[in-house]
């Protein structure tokens, strides 16, 4: 009999770096290597979060 997932379980998502199935130890990645690649992208500035000015901020 196949193992059943709980009713509220989220569907498994692939590794965001290489697309392979994720493993629990490195989730959401498939390996330590993909975790390190993602961390390097954040630290090197490849990934950025856009910021928009709001009315309360002073213009410089």
From Swiss-Prot:
Its cofactor is Zn(2+). Gene3D superfamilies: Erythroid Transcription Factor GATA-1, subunit A. Keywords: Metal-binding, Zinc. It comes from the Bacteria. Binds 1 zinc ion. GO terms for molecular function: DNA topoisomerase type II (double strand cut, ATP-hydrolyzing) inhibitor activity; zinc ion binding. InterPro entries: DNA_gyrase_inhibitor_YacG, Znf_NHR/GATA. GO terms for biological process: regulation of DNA-templated transcription. Zn(2+) binds at residues 15, 18, 30, 34. SUPFAM superfamilies: Glucocorticoid receptor-like (DNA-binding domain). NCBIfam families: PRK01343.1. Interacts with GyrB. Belongs to the DNA gyrase inhibitor YacG family. Inhibits all the catalytic activities of DNA gyrase by preventing its interaction with DNA. Acts by binding directly to the C-terminal domain of GyrB, which probably disrupts DNA binding by the gyrase. This is DNA gyrase inhibitor YacG. It comes from Nitrobacter hamburgensis (strain DSM 10229 / NCIMB 13809 / X14).
């Amino acid at each position: 009999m196949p193992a059943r997932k709980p009713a509220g379980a989220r569907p498994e998502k692939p590794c965001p770096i290489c697309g392979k199935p994720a493993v629990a130890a490195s989730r959401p990645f498939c390996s330590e290597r993909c975790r390190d690649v993602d961390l390097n992208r954040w630290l090197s500035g490849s990934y950025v979060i856009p910021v928009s000015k709001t009315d309360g901020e002073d213009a410089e």
